[in-house]
Each structure stands twice: as structure tokens, then as C-alpha cells.
Amino acid sequence: QLTAVRQALDPANLRPRILLADTVGLGKTLEIGMILAELVRRGRGERILIVTPRHVLEQMQHEMWSRFALPFVRLDSVGIQRVRRSVPASRNPFSVFHRAIISIDTLKSDRYLNHLRKQRWDAVVIDESHNVTNKGTLNNRLADILARQTDALILASATPHNGDPKSFAELIRLLEPTAVRADGNLDEEAVRRLVIRRHRHSDEVRDVVGGRWKERLTPVNRLVAPSPAEDAVAGELSRTWLHRADDAAPPGGRKAGS
């Protein structure tokens, strides 16, 4: 994962922009977290937006907090509407929380476009970015807006190629428009700088891991009651990060007991 951090934050890159295209199982989420944590350490990660498919929202939020101590407020459409009602009409709702994680299906809505075009970010992450490559779609429109409004851009996809060279070129264009020539061909030197693509048989992976791949086990989920100390921490986090006013519900869900 250190390779990804070094490449993304290489001084030669005026803006940290990269496509993490490692195959499944090589730790793209860890690479994302390490890059973001280093940006924060350098004072370049105050405002961060993570955009993911809905089904991985909670997992991504948990990984960022548990592994890198990076708290993100998870927002859905209801939560965003609550934020809009709690701030003056002239204030951009996406300026309220400095670090947010929102599903792409929520964020691509027409109702948020004007706000997103006016909001700057230090870093934007788009997970499973192969879903934003089709020109003219709502997903692609959202990605294009965010790419223009951020300094650092991290795209992550285990399948950046879908058989159509134009799809891969679109990912590169989001990172660096000048890397796609007028004839549609790519600047190969720029691609090498912008893309990390490894699989289990890559030399770097083989040198580190060898053949020591463990078989994946089926996860077993058990419901465990929290301790009083854990309840206290959860309450403090909820009051500090989620509640905007007394008796307000968390932006992403209902009030406790409702």
C-alpha cells in the first residue's frame, strides 16, 4: 500500500490524483485511507468527500474511523434535507460537515447540482469508479463536477477496463484531462503516473506475499451488546459529530427510540 501513497503524493504531481486499480483483495480501501491520512497530516485534507455505492457506505465509514481515526458523517437524502433546513438558505449544505461519506445514488440527484458546483474540496474519493465512465449519465455528470471542484482525486476500481477503451480513457480524463489527446489516445507517460494496477501475480505483490494467500473464510456476524464505556463513547460521538442542535436527529437516520 505504501507504493500507492508515494505515487499519489509524489512531488511531481502538482495535484494528488490517482486511479487505484488493484485487483480485489489487495487493499484499495487501505490505500485510500493511507492517502487521506497523509493529506490530513500535511494540512491538505480538511474537507474530504467520499462517494461510494450505497451497500458499502457503512463499511467504508467504519474502515476510515477504525483504521485511520478519520471520522466521516454518513449522509443520505433525508440527512441532507435536514441539514438544509438547519442552516440559512444562503449557506451551502455541503459546507456544514468537513468530512462526509455519501452514496452516489443520493448525490447524483439534480437537486444537489448547484450546491456541488459551488463547493470546493481538498480531496474527493469515488469508489467503484467504473460506474461513472458512461458519458451523459447522471453518475458521469456527478464525477465530472466533483473532479473540477477538488484538489486531490482518488478513483478506485478493480475493473477499470470493461472492454471499451473509451471507458478507461474517461477515468483518465477525470484525473487529468490533458492526458487524453484530441484523437482519443492516451498519454502513456501520464497513465503510468496516474494509475496503480496490480494483481496477485505482479512482481511487487509476489515479492512481498509470495504464495502465502490465505483462503477467505465466510464471515460470521454476531450481535454483541455494547459495554457501558462503549455506549458512552457512542453517545459522545453522536452528540459531537451528528447532532446539529438539541433534540435534532442524526443527519443519516432517526433519533434513538423513534
What is each PLM-predicted segment?
Residues 15-35:
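Walker A/P-loop
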Residues 1-21:
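Conserved pre-motif I regulatory segment
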Residues 25, 127, 157:
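Conserved G/P- and acidic residue-centered "switch" motifs that form tight phosphate/ATP-binding loops
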Residues 3-6, 28-31, 37-141, 145-148, ...:
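SF2 helicase/translocase NTPase motor core
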Residues 14-18, 46, 98, 151-152:
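Pre-Walker A (Motif I) flank of P-loop NTPase domains
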Residues 89-90, 96, 100-121, 136-151, ...:
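Inter-lobe coupling linker of SF2 helicases/translocases
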Residues 23, 53, 159:
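P-loop (Walker A) phosphate-binding loop of NTP-binding proteins
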